[in-house]
Every structure is written in structure tokens, then in C-alpha cells.
Amino acid sequence: EKSIENLLDKNVDLGDYIGLRFLGITLGNSKINDKKNIDSEIKAKNVYVGIMPFRSFLKQKWIVKISPNQAAINIDRDFFKRDESYKNVRSTKKLQSKYELNFNLNKYSDLKFNKAGLKTKVKGNVIYKSSNRQIIANLKSNFDKKGFLKFKFNTKLNQDFLKLDLFSNGLDLENSEYIIGNRKINFKKGTFKSNFKFNKSSKRTFCEGRFSFTNLKIKPEDFAENINSDSTRFFCKDNNLIVNSEKLNYGTLTSNFNLN
């Protein structure tokens, strides 16, 4: 537990030992929470932790498979941030071993971002590589019969590198509430679709594809009237993100606009 706490800069409770399994063990009631906010936590009823011997041998590093069951991810937006004092201590220590963590969410697990209003279920795979502090994820999100959102991302912590793919063939936004920036926005109706890719590196930043909102009706906090739009589209052209909105309406004002 102490080693994992030092690695993650979080409070760690591995829970109860349940028993041995092939090339691993099963733990019960495991949880990880933030040191500054214990209500921001990740927990699971059962967790299988095992070594992947053949891949470990071929790649010459420890590859660990972690499969949580009945997991709940209830975190705030700062959960993955680390104190500067912690970063300075880590930077002075040379990592002695290379390893790879493979998180397998085979069944849908609850995901909630406390201060963003986002609540959904996710399943998929997340890989963490210690050698370059890389995170690779391929996840599918289920919004309780309102539709699905698939996203892939690849990033290297503390480096200027990010790849993001976002896909949905139709996500119903009716009666959803989110916090964007510091403002609460109530989606009274609308549909979100996406086939969007974003890539960023130290040498280049570009995007591909598009995403859109149709039949949109929202009520931002502190706004007197609803904002309505038949169609608002964001699409990439010549490495620019262009916005096109049709019949945008606020109160008595109705217009069409384009932004580049």
C-alpha cells in the first residue's frame, strides 16, 4: 500500500485478501482516494491483480493486469493533479524498474465527475507505461439509454503530447446538466454527434472530422433566456476549427453565424 501511495500520491487501501487465482490474487473492497478530498475516490468490490508472464518476458518489463469488478469512479477534476512538492521529490528519484499497468474494465463501471455534472458508465481498457509516463485508453461510455460515446486518447504526462478521438452517432442531451468552465449549463433538449480527432505535439497541433449539436435548447446559469439552435456544427478545415450555427435564437434575437 505504501509503495502505491508514493507512486500515485493518493491514499490507498488495498482491502481484504480473498484468494489466489492463476498468476495473481483477488482483493476485496479496495479503494483509492484523494489526500485533500477523501470523497473523491475510486473503489471496487473485487479486484484481480496478476502478472502477464509472456508479455513481460518479451518486453523485458513487468506487465501487470488489473481487472476491477463492480467499480465506482467518483472523482473531482483535480484528482489526477499532483502537488509541486511531490513532483520535485519524484524528479530527484531515478525509477529503478520499468512496468506497465493494464486496467481492464470488462463490465460497465460507474463514473462521476463531482464538479462537472458528468455521470455515466464506462468500460474498456486503460494502459499506463512507466518508462515515458504514457496513458493509452480506449473506452465506451453508456448514458443510461440516451446513447453511447466512444473515446480514445493517448497522452504522456508532463509532456506536450495528446491524441484524442471522440465518436458518437447520437447522444440525447435532454434534461442533462453540466458545468463548463465555471458556468452551469442546463441542456433542456438536443442531440450530440461526433467523428472528431485532435492531435497535439511539441511540433504540431491539428484536428480532423467534426462534431455537432442539433435541435439544441440550453439555459446557461445567469442567462435570462434560453439559447436555441436548429444546428450548430464544429468542423475542421485546413487545420482550423470552424463553427457554423443555423437559426441561433436568444430571446428576440435570431441569426446565423460562422466563426473561424
Regions found by a protein language model. Give the residues of each.
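Amphipathic hydrophobic-ligand
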Residues: 10-11, 36-51, 80, 87, ...
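Gram-negative outer-membrane beta-barrel proteins
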Residues: 74-76, 109-111, 147, 172-176, ...
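Transmembrane beta-strands of outer-membrane beta-barrel pores
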Residues: 70, 107, 143, 170-172, ...
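N-terminal type II signal-anchor transmembrane helix
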Residues: 1-7, 125
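Sec-dependent signal peptide cleavage junction
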Residues: 2, 87-90
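Flexible beta-edge/linker motif
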Residues: 10-11, 15-82, 89-111, 149-154, ...
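Short, exposed beta-strand/loop patches in secreted or surface proteins that constitute
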Residues: 16-18, 125-130, 153-157, 232-235, ...
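Short, hydrophobic/aromatic-rich segments at coil-to-beta transitions
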Residues: 100-104, 130-139, 237-244
